[in-house]
Amino acid sequence: KVLAPTNCGSGYQVVVRLQRRKRLAFDARTTLEKDERDLYWRLTRRVIPTLYRFKGNDRAIPIIEDVAVPPETLPDFLTTLQNIFKSHQITASVFSHAGHGQLHIRPFMDISNKTEMHKLHSLADAVYDEVLRLGGTISGEHGAGLSRTAFVRKQYGPLYDVFREVKRIFDPQNLFNPDKVVSNSTVPVDANLRPVSSQVAVTTNVDPPLPAAPASGESPPVVQLQVHWNENEFAFATRSCNGCGRCRSQSPSERMCPVFRLGTVEESSPRAKANLMRAVLTGSIDPHMLETEQLKGIADLCVNCHQCRLECPANVDIPKLMLEAKSQYVATNGLRPQQWLLGRIDLLSALGSRFSRAGNWALSNRQTRWLLEKLTGIAQGRKLPPFAAGNFLRVAHRRRLTRPSRAPGNKVALFLDVYANYNDTMLAEAVVAVLQHNGVSVYVPPDQVQSGMALLSMGAADRARKLAQRNVATLAEAVRQGYHVVTTEPSAALCLTHEYQNLLDDEDDKLVARNTSEICNYLLRLHQSGRLELDLRPINTTLGYHQPCHVRAINQGRAAENLLRLIPGLKVKSLQKGCSGMAGSWGIAKKNYRNSLRAGWGLISALREPDIQIGTTECTSCKMQMEQGTTKPTVHPSKLLALSYGLVPEFESLLSKRGQELITT
């Protein structure tokens, strides 16, 4: 593939250059589509970071990565290069711009192993000797930099003294980039590698400390881990970041990182958070700093959207690292009262649904909302979902849905979470109706509790673990009876399939994870297997679909969008405007309210377009944000399917319903 950036010259020059190169290629493809173009650029940018996905202690070290030799000597040079690696007993990755003889070479080495590090200088020496013998250069594209300073004299000989004199004239105090390109002393080739050796012992509540490598004879400090990590997984996660900076992207084709995009300061970036935890483990930062407000402030800049975990070329699990960091603080200091209330929103919702008239009046009244903000920290201006009159678990009990069936066939265990249970019982009604219409037996486990995502996002790992244990015990039994777990809430699906495995370590949580789906994905799989009823009535309207971050995080693609396109007459417009900016309890809080709106303004503005009548999304939090800046309703895809099937007569008013000032539809 040949990618031609806009700085290649005039259009005519680009065409001429491409025509000359085309005869050297086996095939060529012209792409004019934005998505395809972005794909090709992403492929070129991700080669190097992908090398850091390999498990184990060996890392791809960029010491000799930029050599160039005359193209005609490339075959012989590659043979010699392989022999050099063999003699040093080193494996390396090699990729190149073969047309002009440039190679990117990254040996895989354990930089915590001093014996291996001793090989580094002799390896570079041998490679550079061969490069210079062939008339090449040690830095063909990226400049000499720190890693090649020790070898610049070898390439330039007497001219090196001229370089030093120029440096002395313009920078007599050696303030700018000291020891880069030219140096007054011999700089070891590994002088600027980041420390990775653990100087801190880590332990769990039940395990003995994992060994560290203290510099002195003193006992190393011990960090008691709050999150479940496999052996050496924590250390590996902290050093997996290679510092490439892709997480600082502002590209509209990527989502990471919504908080960094608000204010492009380094501490907001996922990279900074990986460096923070690595510094703790290597002893550069006192582990007790994890218990301070200073480090908690940085950890709180992670809103647990999981987009960096998905889009990081090296797959660094920043959300899990930040869950550990937040949990360290909470384990020592506890939750603030306002955080506790937001984390146990199920208790507030249960109270609100029991007294729904009074609760909904309080939510829609400016004076009571002012008081609510003072007591709970929930932003006064944030539209909140109204309470239902009663909860769906009681409805399910009356309809005998809380009794498991032994009958064969497709069977679903419906996990409600908070919103479908206390705020929008009609959503649960819609899901049950759609599933039963398609011949699926529905069971609503009566012992289920909230998923605990809000608690996880705050770092209350112990409290979330208790909820996880209860849910896993209930749902695992349902799975063993032949049920597949389905939920309407993407955050709940993420908890069941991913987050609970960060809290628990047993076979049941893995069993539940393997057998859990978000409702739209489950229905789409029914359609793909030819088992979804297609007796859908037309809905003649245009809607804007937003894909939630947590739907992306569970790798379910665009199931809801594809399902909605089955409905006759329904025009689906994909609103690809990044994160909604809500991030669950983060966007509800007063202190984050304005930043939440800034992060989601692109989505809100897109929904205001006159050709869009309604919005749709799977996520409750995203729905709240989508209705924040408009009176247009945002409707769950399951409700639209139920409406199209003609299953719930009350849904006829869905498309014309309008939100209120402080309450969502």
Q: What is each PLM-predicted segment?
A:
Residues K1-D58, P62, T91, S96, ...:
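Terminal amphipathic helices with adjacent charged low-complexity linkers/tails
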Residues K1-S96, G101-G140, G145-V206, E218-S251, ...:
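Noncatalytic alpha-helical scaffold of FAD-dependent oxidoreductases
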Residues K1-V2, D58-V69, H104-S112, G145-T149, ...:
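Glycine- and acidic
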Residues L3-N7, E36-Y40, T50, H100-H104, ...:
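Flexible loop/turn segments at secondary-structure boundaries
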Residues A28-L32, K55-G56, E141-G143, F176-V182, ...:
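Short coil/turn segments at secondary-structure boundaries
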Residues P62, I111-E116, L146-Q155, V222-W229, ...:
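Short beta-alpha connecting loops at secondary-structure transitions
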Residues D171, P178, P209, P319-T665:
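Iron-sulfur cluster-binding electron-transfer modules in prokaryotic oxidoreductases
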Residues E233-R261, E267, Q294-V316, L348-G352, ...:
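Cysteine-centered iron-sulfur cluster-binding motifs in ferredoxin-type domains/subunits
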